[in-house]
């Protein structure tokens, strides 16, 4: 099992990165929260990873902090919660907010995760409530060289839309949010665009 990767950031996108470790490129799937903490391409980077082995694929999931990885593992232990949904949860909320919601059985917050309805939220709270006390939460340890990369304005809207669709938001929701976001003024940074879009998509 690969527990962490330390090397240079060869490429980054809202849903995955390529890490160059001694000349070997590893494709690693990430949350938007981790994306927002990444350094610029070419700089040193550390990701805490989870390895998933399937019959047809060897998949890596990376996180900028230990707490993100712990909550990812916790969420994927729930029956019916896959890696995509766990990444969506970590893209929408901090690990601390998710743990608080689970411990308090806050279904309202859990239902704001893309793809999570009331029944899924109830199952998450029921299956995980007893496990929370055994989950130590260390102080956040972030990826090496954290920085924000300015995106290419020409492809910014398309990249943000792709990231939101991958999280489970519906095309009409994404189109409406991005139309409102970009009509408010010029945005040239993808991190700013993603945060703004997620805020607009969050239930009032």
Curated annotation (Swiss-Prot):
Residues 154-204 are annotated as: Domain III. Pfam families: HHH_5, RuvA_C, RuvA_N. GO terms for molecular function: ATP binding; four-way junction DNA binding; four-way junction helicase activity. GO terms for biological process: DNA recombination; DNA repair. It is found in: Cytoplasm. Keywords: Cytoplasm, DNA damage, DNA recombination, DNA repair, DNA-binding. Residues 65-143 are annotated as: Domain II. Residues 1-64 are annotated as: Domain I. It comes from the Bacteria. Residues 144-154 are annotated as: Flexible linker. GO terms for cellular component: cytoplasm; Holliday junction helicase complex; Holliday junction resolvase complex. Gene3D superfamilies: 5' to 3' exonuclease, C-terminal subdomain, DNA helicase RuvA subunit, C-terminal domain, Nucleic acid-binding proteins. The keyword Cell cycle does not apply. Has three domains with a flexible linker between the domains II and III and assumes an 'L' shape. Domain III is highly mobile and contacts RuvB. Belongs to the RuvA family. Homotetramer. Forms an RuvA(8)-RuvB(12)-Holliday junction (HJ) complex. HJ DNA is sandwiched between 2 RuvA tetramers; dsDNA enters through RuvA and exits via RuvB. An RuvB hexamer assembles on each DNA strand where it exits the tetramer. Each RuvB hexamer is contacted by two RuvA subunits (via domain III) on 2 adjacent RuvB subunits; this complex drives branch migration. In the full resolvosome a probable DNA-RuvA(4)-RuvB(12)-RuvC(2) complex forms which resolves the HJ. The RuvA-RuvB-RuvC complex processes Holliday junction (HJ) DNA during genetic recombination and DNA repair, while the RuvA-RuvB complex plays an important role in the rescue of blocked DNA replication forks via replication fork reversal (RFR). RuvA specifically binds to HJ cruciform DNA, conferring on it an open structure. The RuvB hexamer acts as an ATP-dependent pump, pulling dsDNA into and through the RuvAB complex. HJ branch migration allows RuvC to scan DNA until it finds its consensus sequence, where it cleaves and resolves the cruciform DNA. This is Holliday junction branch migration complex subunit RuvA. It comes from Magnetococcus marinus (strain ATCC BAA-1437 / JCM 17883 / MC-1). The gene is ruvA.
């Amino acid at each position: 099992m690969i527990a962490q990767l330390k090397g240079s950031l060869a490429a980054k996108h809202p849903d995955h990165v390529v890490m160059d470790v001694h000349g070997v490129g590893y494709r690693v799937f990430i949350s938007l929260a981790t994306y927002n903490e990444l350094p610029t391409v070419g700089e040193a980077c550390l990701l805490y990873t989870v390895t998933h082995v399937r019959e047809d694929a060897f998949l890596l999931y990376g996180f900028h902090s230990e707490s993100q990885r712990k909550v990812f593992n916790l969420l994927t232990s729930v029956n019916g919660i896959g890696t995509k949904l766990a990444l969506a949860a970590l893209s929408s909320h901090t690990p601390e907010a998710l743990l608080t919601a689970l411990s308090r059985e806050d279904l309202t917050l859990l239902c704001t995760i893309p793809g999570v309805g009331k029944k899924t939220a109830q199952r998450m709270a029921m299956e995980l409530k007893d496990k929370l006390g055994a989950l130590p939460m260390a102080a956040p340890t972030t990826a090496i060289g954290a920085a924000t990369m300015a995106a290419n304005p020409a492809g910014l809207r398309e990249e943000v839309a792709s990231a939101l669709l991958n999280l489970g938001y519906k095309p009409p929701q994404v189109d409406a949010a991005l139309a409102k976001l970009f009509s408010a003024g010029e945005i040239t940074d993808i991190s700013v665009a993603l945060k703004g879009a997620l805020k607009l998509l969050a239930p009032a």
